[in-house]
């Protein structure tokens, strides 16, 4: 039993020494808590912020929103039907094939 008493005494002494070492830190911490009482109360922000974050994915700007919207549309679009008979590029137009250009109602400033 006598062997346990010095161990207990040494443990108490160590605790006192630790308290002395950490007491300046605790004193500084107490000063900061007195000066800024609202800090450290609610980690993670206000209730409003937490509620908004729980609602789901939010977008950085309208570009992100539109890109996500386009991705969703692309997944829902049906594939093009292959039964189209219209072929493009088989005929090269000539000036005679093109329709006549309509004259402009506003006179050009360049035509003198």
UniProtKB/Swiss-Prot annotation:
Location of the protein in the cell: Cytoplasm
Which tissue types show expression of this protein?
Isoform ARPP-19 is found in all brain regions and also present in non-neuronal tissues. Isoform ARPP-16 is enriched in the caudate nucleus, found in low levels in cerebral cortex.
Q: Which family does it belong to?
A: Belongs to the endosulfine family.
Q: Where is this region: Disordered?
A: 1-49, 72-112
Name the job this protein performs.
Protein phosphatase inhibitor that specifically inhibits protein phosphatase 2A (PP2A) during mitosis. Inhibition of PP2A is enhanced when ARPP19 is phosphorylated. When phosphorylated at Ser-62 during mitosis, specifically interacts with PPP2R2D (PR55-delta) and inhibits its activity, leading to inactivation of PP2A, an essential condition to keep cyclin-B1-CDK1 activity high during M phase. May indirectly enhance GAP-43 expression.
Q: Which organism is it from?
A: Bos taurus
Which parts of the sequence carry N-acetylserine?
A: 2
Which residues carry the post-translational modification N6-acetyllysine, per the record?
Answer: 109
Q: Which PANTHER family match?
A: CAMP-REGULATED PHOSPHOPROTEIN 19, ENDOSULFINE
PTM description: Phosphorylation at Ser-62 by MASTL/GWL during mitosis is essential for interaction with PPP2R2D (PR55-delta) and subsequent inactivation of PP2A. Phosphorylated by PKA.
Q: Per the record, where are the segments of Basic and acidic residues compositional bias?
A: 12-32
> Subunit structure of this entry?
Interacts (when phosphorylated at Ser-62) with PPP2R2D. Interacts with SNCA. Interacts with PPP2R2A; the interaction is direct and this interaction inhibits PP2A activity.
One GO MF term on file is: protein phosphatase regulator activity
Looking up Pfam families in the UniProt record yields:
Endosulfine (PF04667)
Q: What is the lineage of its organism?
A: Eukaryota, Metazoa, Chordata, Craniata, Vertebrata
Protein name as annotated: cAMP-regulated phosphoprotein 19
Q: Where is the composition biased (Low complexity)?
A: 1-11
Kindly indicate whether the keyword Cell division belongs to this entry.
Answer: yes
Which positions carry Phosphoserine? 2, 23, 62, 104
A biological process term (GO) from this entry:
G2/M transition of mitotic cell cycle
Which UniProt keywords are given for this protein, alphabetically ordered? Acetylation, Cell cycle, Cell division, Cytoplasm, Mitosis, Phosphoprotein, Protein phosphatase inhibitor
Q: Which GO terms describe its cellular component?
A: cytoplasm
Q: Which domain of life is it from?
A: Eukaryota
